[in-house]
Curated annotation (Swiss-Prot):
The lineage of its organism: Eukaryota, Metazoa, Chordata, Craniata, Vertebrata. Residues 1-175 form the PRELI/MSF1 domain. InterPro entries: PRELI/MSF1_dom (IPR006797), Slowmo/Ups (IPR037365). PANTHER family: MSF1/PX19 RELATED (PTHR11158). One of its GO terms (cellular component) is mitochondrial intermembrane space. GO terms for biological process: phospholipid transport. This is PRELI domain-containing protein 2. GO terms for molecular function: phosphatidic acid transfer activity. The gene is prelid2. It comes from Xenopus laevis. It holds the Pfam family PRELI.
């Protein structure tokens, strides 16, 4: 079956500020569940100038304890892989993320885009689509998908709030 979460947001800050804030957002005291982010690969295409990065995030397992009684869910840390392509010429950064921890039981993906706004070059448009499909947990599939949908909705709101806070702290008042 699966679930999907979509969000759109305009940050009233220039693309460069938003991208720098995003790439340096974690770890932060504003989000206790993201423990570390490690860049495992980074390269720049000499022809296009596009910067490719692959990062691994280490996060706390936020699955409720009553569900962690099932051995497949009882892990202390969850690992996420993020790939990004940053094109400063076109002012677009595309990201794809997936969960590595439960890959044999579920497909969890996010696709995000940050790009300079066509309405105002001092603004940055953000779009994100996340999907979760759980197939390997038997009767728990739907329960876990419902939890995932609630968690993703809350996570998106919190992530946007963290970005807004970091942008205000680093860049001051928003641009109009």
């Amino acid at each position: 079956m699966g679930i999907a979460v979509e969000v759109r947001k305009v940050y009233p800050y220039p693309f460069q500020h938003v991208v720098n804030s995003y790439l340096n957002k974690y770890p932060t005291p504003l989000e206790k569940h993201v423990l570390a982010i490690k860049t495992v690969e980074e390269k720049t295409d000499p022809a296009s100038g596009v910067v490719y990065r692959k990062r691994i995030a280490t996060c706390n397992n936020v699955i409720p304890s009553f569900l962690q009684r099932f051995s497949i869910l009882k892990v202390s840390n969850v690992y996420l892989e993020e790939e990004s392509w940053l094109d400063m010429k076109t002012k677009v950064m595309t990201l794809k993320s997936r969960c590595l921890t439960w890959a044999q039981y579920a497909t969890m993906k996010e696709e995000s885009v940050y790009k300079e706004s066509i309405e105002n070059s001092n603004w940055t448009e953000f779009t994100q689509r996340g999907t979760v499909t759980i197939t390997g947990a038997g009767f728990l599939n739907r329960v876990l998908e419902t939890f995932a949908q609630t968690f993703l909705n809350q996570g998106v709101k919190k992530s946007i709030s963290i970005m807004e806070t970091i942008l205000r702290e680093r860049c001051g008042c928003p641009f109009s």
